[in-house]
Amino acid sequence: MSTVKVNAIRSTSGTSDAITLNSSSGVTAINGASLKAHNLIINGAFTVAQRGTSATAEEYATVDRFELSHGGEDEDCTQAQHALTSSDTGPWAKGFRYSYHITNGNQTSGGDAGDFCFIRYRAEAQDIASSGWDYTSASSYVTLSFWVKASVAQNYYGYIRTDDGTSQGYPFQTGSLSANTWTK
């Protein structure tokens, strides 16, 4: 077996490298375009829960880097690190073993306009800055991809917000979810 050691590959008629490499991360660019498809979410697989695995407390109480906020409801929401099993088709097949589980408490008076329960993740500015996404430009994009399962079939809402510089908000919808079915 032969080994060729290089840090770049360039066509004999080329004026710039077609592929660049480094010793720690392999291929770093193709035709000058950086490979930026890495996950920006720290603990996005919910494997670390230093504070505990279940709580009704708000803020950072279970899964690291993820915060629960709620208010107005009859009974507090519960947050938990939930162990997935092979019956959790979808995320299990992709190697995920945990989820961040939110249980809405018994709302005997029904949902009111001011009731809310949401998850917050605060991405680090350095990760957003190195992602290649220019959140101030309408022609720059980032992909938000996640698995979701709900016990109630309906459309759910969320948003991405940045507080770097001028605050920017980007709302999104899950689309109509089927009850108790994992969707990506």
Q: Residues of each region from the PLM?
A:
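Extracellular and organelle-lumenal recognition/adhesion modules and their flexible linkers in secreted
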Residues: 3-184
